[in-house]
Regions:
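Short amphipathic alpha-helical interaction segments
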Residues: 36-51
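Short acidic, hydrophobic short linear motifs in intrinsically disordered regions
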Residues: 22-32
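Short helix-coil-helix linker/hinge
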Residues: 6-9, 22, 85
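Hydrophobic residues on short alpha-helical segments
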Residues: 11-17, 92
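A short, conserved structural fragment
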Residues: 50-60
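The C-terminal cap of the DNA-recognition helix in HTH/winged-HTH DNA-binding domains
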Residues: 19, 50-51, 97
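Amphipathic alpha-helical dimerization/coiled-coil segments
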Residues: 77-115
């Protein structure tokens, strides 16, 4: 089953959830008010993400179904497919042109590639 799409504002919400879960929905609303300047929007986002299978809200306790890593991987796969024709070298080349990589970053990428 593919990972449900998490849009940008929903992702910011999920970042708060992933950091604090499990969390009471009232406490999550309070955090979103403080960090995102949301009030009633939070309840709408909770409902929408529950309907799409991203989070669950049981007995007013909100937890994630989709992990941060799963959401990041899904977004990366979509971007790689749409923008780079699934070419890791094209992606790395584009990233390297935009931002100079430090020797440490280059070494870390090398270690990851070599497995």
């Amino acid at each position: 089953m593919p990972t449900p799409k998490i849009f940008e504002s929903e992702y910011r919400f999920c970042l708060i959830l992933w950091e604090h879960e499990p969390i009471k929905s009232m406490e999550l609303v309070k955090l979103c008010r403080e960090k995102l300047d949301w009030s009633k929007t939070t309840y709408t986002v909770i409902k929408r993400l529950c309907e799409r299978g991203v989070i669950r809200n049981e007995n007013a306790i909100v937890t994630s179904i989709i992990s941060k890593e799963e959401a990041q991987m899904s977004e990366l796969e979509e971007m790689m497919d749409k923008k780079f024709e699934n070419s890791l070298p094209a992606f790395i080349a584009a990233f390297g042109r935009k931002q100079a990589l430090s020797d440490a970053q280059i070494e870390e990428i090398r270690r990851i590639i070599e497995g």
